[in-house]
Amino acid sequence: MTNSIIMIEHEMKLKLELDNLVVLCGDQRVTYPLNKIECIVLDNMNASITGRLLSKLAEENICLITTDKKHLPIGIYSPYYGYSRSSKMLGAQIEFSRCGGQLWTDIVRSKIINQAKTLELLNFDSRVVDNLISYANSVEIDDLSNKESFAAKVYFNELMGVTFSRGNEEILINGALDYAYAIIRSMIAKVGIGCGLNMHLGIHHKNEYNDYNLADDLIEPFRPIVDLYVYKLMEGEEFFSSSHRKDIINLLYKKILYKGLNIDIGQAIVEYVKSFAKLVRENENTIEYPNVENVEFADERFVFDHYIDDYIFTEVERDEL
């Protein structure tokens, strides 16, 4: 993933000028080329953005994520049309969604194996690891016996403790997990739309009120990678801060061995979603699932702050750019 992720953390105005993003604060300004931007995270509820810029972001398939008062992602702005042959792809996707049971089986199995490996990497009880591997090996077509749910309970009880609940907002790490999952989900949705996929049409998730059912399917094997990263990041911390949010965005730039290449996790997401689109379009399965053991969580940060008086415009990008 060669482009940058832009975070807007303060009260600023975003506008379009000659195919550039312009960030204004008073009479101060920062300009950044749109063709170098992957995503913009609007992390301040008083920041504003012009209609012309919104239109251009959609045209260029640049993802815009908005957050709530707790700084958690709450919305994704993405193109209405993302592909020149979207109607043809839609037909293929509808047909595929009727017979995607084997793919969901593979996704669930990959997720549970990564959960087991996450516990193993953190030196948790080997008996629990073996139990999860057993769950993974016994997943049925379309996971009719719901091994995913059973495995998740065993996994989180071991990782976080038996009193842990993913729905409890008072547990600090839940906010960090929600933030990280939302960032990965947004990237999957962005790439999927660019491939002509309709994100409403899930393989397993079928919620009529969810615009991103497919993203919620495809994200599953990446969740344990997020869990491991966030677990290490938040260990011993008392607050979920702006610094943590930047570190979580940096997860997209951590290296992973994927399809024989040492690439960014963000680029692995691109290749992963493209492989799914190829399966739908051509009935050729080249999907490789991410392996948590192949991720390098090096202590690197590619964060550069552009100061506008007392305000900060944060750019998160690759080291070689």
Feature map (PLM): residue ranges:
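Short low-complexity stretches enriched in small and charged residues
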Residues: 17-24, 63, 139-140, 173-174
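Short secondary-structure boundary/capping segments within folded domains
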Residues: 13, 29-33, 54-56
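A short alpha-helix capping/helix-coil boundary motif
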Residues: 31-34, 166-168
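Glycine/small-residue-rich interface belts in oligomeric ring/scaffold proteins
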Residues: 36-85
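Structured surface patches comprising rigid loops and adjacent beta-strands/short helices at the edges
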Residues: 11-14, 19, 33-45
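N-terminal, Lys/Arg-enriched amphipathic/low-complexity engagement segments
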Residues: 1-29
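Active-site helix-to-loop segments that bind/position phosphate- or nucleotide-bearing substrates
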Residues: 2-5, 11-12, 59, 71-321
